[in-house]
Amino acid sequence: MNNMNIEDFNNKRFYLFGSEWIINIVDNIEPEVDEDGYKHHYAGMTHNATQKIEIARSVKEEKLSNEMMCKTLIHELVHVICNTGAYFNYSNDEPFIEFMARGILSLLKQDLICK
């Protein structure tokens, strides 16, 4: 895990529950503006309709570290697992998704998950 380069995942395709997904590493993700006019900036985004994950290299013009981008990828992958498994309520629970992503990242760092 410690030598994982996030750029190696750019344009990587994978399959989950019969669906093909693609990971794109992008310079930034366009902020979303809510009904109150507040801009939401994201390090990652899962697009279920197009089966695409985007991971940003920077947020608000601040470059993200490789480790932060890897954590963000794991976070988005947990969203994909929940959504493709029809666990939509879990996918909408950001604290749960972040909790799972940090747990998986911790196991990866300890080389406890198969390579």
Regions found by a protein language model. Name each.
Residues D8-E67, V80-T84, F88-G103:
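Active-site scaffold of zinc-dependent metalloenzymes
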Residues S106-K115:
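Short, Lys/Arg-rich amphipathic alpha-helical interaction segments
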